[in-house]
Amino acid sequence: MKIIFPILSNPVFRRTVKLLLCLLWIGYSQGTTHVLRFGGIFEYVESGPMGAEELAFRFAVNTINRNRTLLPNTTLTYDTQKINLYDSFEASKKACDQLSLGVAAIFGPSHSSSANAVQSICNALGVPHIQTRWKHQVSDNKDSFYVSLYPDFSSLSRAILDLVQFFKWKTVTVVYDDSTGLIRLQELIKAPSRYNLRLKIRQLPADTKDAKPLLKEMKRGKEFHVIFDCSHEMAAGILKQALAMGMMTEYYHYIFTTLDLFALDVEPYRYSGVNMTGFRILNTENTQVSSIIEKWSMERLQAPPKPDSGLLDGFMTTDAALMYDAVHVVSVAVQQFPQMTVSSLQCNRHKPWRFGTRFMSLIKEAHWEGLTGRITFNKTNGLRTDFDLDVISLKEEGLEKIGTWDPASGLNMTESQKGKPANITDSLSNRSLIVTTILEEPYVLFKKSDKPLYGNDRFEGYCIDLLRELSTILGFTYEIRLVEDGKYGAQDDANGQWNGMVRELIDHKADLAVAPLAITYVREKVIDFSKPFMTLGISILYRKPNGTNPGVFSFLNPLSPDIWMYILLAYLGVSCVLFVIARFSPYEWYNPHPCNPDSDVVENNFTLLNSFWFGVGALMQQGSELMPKALSTRIVGGIWWFFTLIIISSYTANLAAFLTVERMESPIDSADDLAKQTKIEYGAVEDGATMTFFKKSKISTYDKMWAFMSSRRQSVLVKSNEEGIQRVLTSDYAFLMESTTIEFVTQRNCNLTQIGGLIDSKGYGVGTPMGSPYRDKITIAILQLQEEGKLHMMKEKWWRGNGCPEEESKEASALGVQNIGGIFIVLAAGLVLSVFVAVGEFLYKSKKNAQLEKRSFCSAMVEELRMSLKCQRRLKHKPQAPVIVKTEEVINMHTFNDRRLPGKETMA
C-alpha cells in the first residue's frame, strides 16, 4: 500500500527544505578547517640549540594560525627535520620522508650542497622549494619549482660598488670566506677595468676562525679600505681580532656584505673611530615590523641559550626574518588556492603533484609587505626583485641609517638630510691623538724651566700654541712625540720608502704632524694636508757682508768707470768740434787792432788749446775768458754747459753717500749668483722639502744647484737648521731654507741676512694619514683661527725679537783722509805736473832768447833765471837790429791764428 504525504508534494515545503539544507551545509563548511602541512629542513651543529631559521619557521606558522586573518579556514602544521651541515644525502632522505607525509612546500635547507639535492627532488615531483639564503643560479636554470627571498647578489654587488664610488676609494681589498664569494662579488671584481680601481683579493682561512695572520698582513700592507664577504659569526670574530691588533681606528673603513651587521654587538667599537658600513634589509622603522620583532625577541629569549656568536640577545637575524616572510608569502598563495589538497608523493615513482604547477605560479605571483620590505619574484628564475636596502654606519650612538639603495634608483645617502646641525667636533671630541713633531725654533722647542717637566709641558713654540688652539676648538686631547729619526720626510729614490714624520703618518704611528712641514706634491700623494697655516718660500741665508770704508779715490765712485770714460770722450769730442766750427764760422774771426779798422788781419780765439780750455772750464763749473761769438759755436757751448750741469749735479748728489756710508758689498745677490760660482758652498736640510724642491726642479738654475749639492752631498747637506745656521756663521757657506725661519734667525743674529727674494712659494700645513677624517675638521679650525687673527698674533709672539740695533746715521759725520785723501793726491799731482811744465816752458823760452840774442844757451838761461828771481819788473828782451823785409812779404805773412781780410789791396 502506498502512503502519500501531501505536504511533501507542496512546492513551498520543498523550497524551505532546500534552503535549510543549504544553510546547514554552509554552517558545516564554515565550522570545518582545512589542514595544510609545510615541511622544513634545517642544518644544525651537533649538540647545538635550535637555529634561528627553524625558530622563525615555527614562529611564523604559529602567528598565522593565531591571527586567522590570512588563512581563516586553513590550519597550518609543519614537519621539521634536522640534518648535518653539508650532508646532501641526508637532506635528500629527509625531503623524501616529508613528501611521503604530504607537504605543500619545503623550506630549506640553507647550504648549497644540501639545497641543491632537495631542489632536484622538488623539481622532479612538482613541489615548491623555498630558499632564504643566497644560492648560485646558472644562466640556463631549469628549476621552475624554486623561489629565493634572499636579494640577488648581482644587485648586492652593485650596491657595494656604488658605496665604493661614493666613498671615492682608489684601492680596495676584498676578503671572502669561500669560493662563492667571488661569484657574489663579480660586479665589484669587474670594476677595476671600468672605474680605475686597484683591487686586492684575499681569502679567509678555511680551517680556522683565526684571522690574525691575514689581518697582520693587511696592516703591514696598509690596506685601509676592506670589504668582508663572510657570515655574521665570522664578522663578529674579525672585529674582535681587529680590535686586538689596533685596526679599529678612524683610518680603517670596513664594508660587510652580511645583512646581519645591525644585529652584531658593536658596543666595544662605538668610540674607536673605525668606519664600519653595511646593509640592512629588515625594515625596522615600520611600526608593525617592530611589533613582530618584539614578539619574536620575547620568544627568542625563552629559547635555550645560544653559543657566543657576537649577536645581540633577542635580535631577529636576516635569515630568520626572511624565513618568517617566506612562510607568509606561501600562505598568500594558499589563500588564493583554497581547493588545493596535498597528497603523499614517493621519490621513487616520479609522479608529480597535480596542484604543484598552479601553486608554484601563485607563489611567484604573490606580493607581500613583510619584515624585509616588498617581496616580489622574477617569474622566470624565482629570484627576488625590487627590494630596498638600508645603508647603515657605525656612529658613537651605535649603528645608524645613513642612506638607502634599491635596484632602480641606486644609492641615496640621506645622512645630511636628518636636519641635524653640522658640528665639526663630532669626530674629534673627546679623542686622544698622537701628534708627531720635530724640534725647530721657533715652531717647537724645549721649554726652559728650573723644574723638571714631563709630557706635553716640555715643549713650547708656535706649533705648540697652534696645537693648543686646535684642541680647544675641536675638543680633542693629544700627546706630543718627537719624530724618531729627526727628519721631516723624504722619499728614497732607491726603494721608494719614506722617512721622518711622513713615514710615521703613513704607518699610522701618529694621527697628526704639527710642525713646519711643507705641503709638496710628492708628500700629498702619500698623506693628507690641511689648508696651510703659514705661507712662505725658499730663500738664502748668508753672513752679513763686512762694511768697507771708502778708499782714497772713492770720490770717483759716484760714477762708474764707463761713465768717466764717456765723459772724457765727450770732452775731447766737444773740444774738437768747437775748434773746427770756430775755424769755419766767419763770425768767430775778429780784428785784433780795433783802432785800425783798415787792418786786413783777423784772429780767432778758439785755437785748439783754447777749445780744450773752454771745455775744462765749463766742466769744472768755473768758466773761462773765452766766449763764443757765432751762433754755431754758442750752440755747441750751450749744449756742453747743459751736459756738464747734469753730470756735475748727479755726481755731487751721489758723492756724499759714497764718502760717508760704509758700502755693504756681498759676493752673492741671488740664486743665480750662487749657481754661477763654486767658491761659496751652499746646501739645505737633508731629506727636507727644500732639498726635494731642488731635486725635482726642472729649471736650469735650480737643476744646476742640485747637481752641485748632490755632488758634495756629505759636505753641504746638513741634518737640521741649527747645523746649517752655525755653518753659515763659521764658514763661507750659504744655507737654503724657508723664509719664515730666516726672518726669525735674522731678528736674533745681526751677523746674518737674507739674500735675494723668494725662490718658490709654498705653505706649512697639518699632516694627517691618507684618508683621515680629521683633515677637514682641522682645516675648518685653521680657517677659523685665521679669520680671528690668532695665527697672526701667534706669529708676532714668536717672531718678534729684540732686533738688531739700527746703524747710526752718518749724515753729519766728519770726513777723514780715508774719505777724501784722493783729492789731495790729485791736487799734489797737478802741482807737480805744473812745476814740470813750468820748467819746460822756462827751458824753451831760454833757448828762444839765446837764439834771438845770439848768445849761448847757458848764459841766456842764467839771465832768465836771474830775472825770474827778482821780485821787480823785468825788461822785455830786445832783439838785434831788425831785418828789412819787403812790404809784400810782410803782408803775406800771418800766424796760424790770424788771416788777411779778403778784398784788401797789396801794400806798396
From Swiss-Prot:
Q: Which gene encodes it?
A: GRIK2
The stretch of residues making up the signal peptide is 1-31
Q: Per its database record, what is this protein's job? A: Ionotropic glutamate receptor that functions as a cation permeable ligand-gated ion channel, gated by L-glutamate and the glutamatergic agonist kainic acid. L-glutamate acts as an excitatory neurotransmitter at many synapses in the central nervous system. Binding of the excitatory neurotransmitter L-glutamate induces a conformation change, leading to the opening of the cation channel, and thereby converts the chemical signal to an electrical impulse. The receptor then desensitizes rapidly and enters a transient inactive state, characterized by the presence of bound agonist. Independent of its ionotropic glutamate receptor activity, acts as a thermoreceptor conferring sensitivity to cold temperatures. Functions in dorsal root ganglion neurons.
**What is the disorder linked to it?**
Intellectual developmental disorder, autosomal recessive 6: A disorder characterized by significantly below average general intellectual functioning associated with impairments in adaptive behavior and manifested during the developmental period. MRT6 patients display mild to severe intellectual disability and psychomotor development delay in early childhood. Patients do not have neurologic problems, congenital malformations, or facial dysmorphism. Body height, weight, and head circumference are normal. Neurodevelopmental disorder with impaired language and ataxia and with or without seizures: An autosomal dominant disorder characterized by axial hypotonia and global developmental delay. Affected individuals show impaired intellectual development, delayed walking, poor speech, and behavioral abnormalities. Some patients have a more severe phenotype with early-onset seizures resembling epileptic encephalopathy, inability to walk or speak, and hypomyelination on brain imaging.
State the organism's lineage: Eukaryota, Metazoa, Chordata, Craniata, Vertebrata
Q: In which tissues is it expressed?
A: Expression is higher in cerebellum than in cerebral cortex.
Query: What happens upon changing I668T?
Result: In NEDLAS; causes markedly reduced peak current amplitudes and very fast gating kinetics; no effect on homomeric receptor localization to the plasma membrane when expressed in heterologous cells
Residues with the modification Phosphoserine, per the entry, are S846, S868
Which organism encodes this protein? Answer: Homo sapiens
Q: Topologically, how does it sit relative to the membrane?
A: Multi-pass membrane protein
| Reactions mediated catalytically | Ca(2+)(in) = Ca(2+)(out); Na(+)(in) = Na(+)(out)
The record lists L-glutamate as bound by P516, A518, R523, A689, T690, E738
Extracellular side: which ranges?
32-561, 657-819
Q: What is this protein called?
A: Glutamate receptor ionotropic, kainate 2
An example Gene Ontology CC term for this record? dendrite cytoplasm
Q: Which Gene3D superfamilies match?
A: 1.10.287.70, 3.40.50.2300, Periplasmic binding protein-like II (3.40.190.10)
Question: Where do transmembrane segments lie in this chain?
Answer: 562-582, 636-656, 820-840
- Disulfide bond listed as a keyword: yes
* Record topology, Cytoplasmic segments: 583-635, 841-908
